[in-house]
């Protein structure tokens, strides 16, 4: 199975100033994608560019980093807006069997669903991130 995982916020930043981590290999989404990979599936992980690690890393699956736009309104630490989501999913929807996107309130989840409603699952993490908007 070929899986696309769209998770712009790779780790929770408690402030608007996102401190870039050296690696994403300790994140939940990395482990999530690694599990799919270890089960023999082809995985592509999409993250927001502000969360791209400071050190160059190699991964056993493809990782794409997309630019977050309109950052004054759609702040990357709480409501990242990556317009590339819609166009990429629309263009490549036939290549993927499953599209998993994170957060029900995400603009990227909406775009993925609009481009491929029959393949998109929206996964919502009920953790610290929800309180950022308060």
Language-model segment annotations:
Residues 56-90:
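A short, charged, and often flexible helix/loop element on the N-terminal side
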């Amino acid at each position: 199975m070929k899986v696309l995982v769209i998770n712009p916020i790779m780790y929770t930043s408690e402030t608007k100033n996102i401190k870039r981590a050296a690696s994403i290999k300790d994140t939940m989404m990395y482990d999530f994608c690694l599990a799919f990979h270890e089960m023999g599936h082809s995985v592509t992980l999409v993250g927001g560019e502000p969360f791209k690690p400071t050190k160059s890393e190699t991964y056993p699956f493809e990782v794409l980093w997309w630019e977050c736009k309109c950052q004054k309104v759609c702040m990357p630490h709480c409501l990242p807006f990556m317009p590339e989501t819609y166009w990429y999913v629309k263009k490549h929807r036939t290549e993927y069997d499953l599209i998993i996107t994170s957060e029900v309130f995400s603009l990227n989840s909406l775009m993925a669903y609009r481009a491929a409603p029959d393949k998109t699952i929206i996964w919502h993490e009920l953790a610290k991130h929800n309180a950022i908007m308060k």
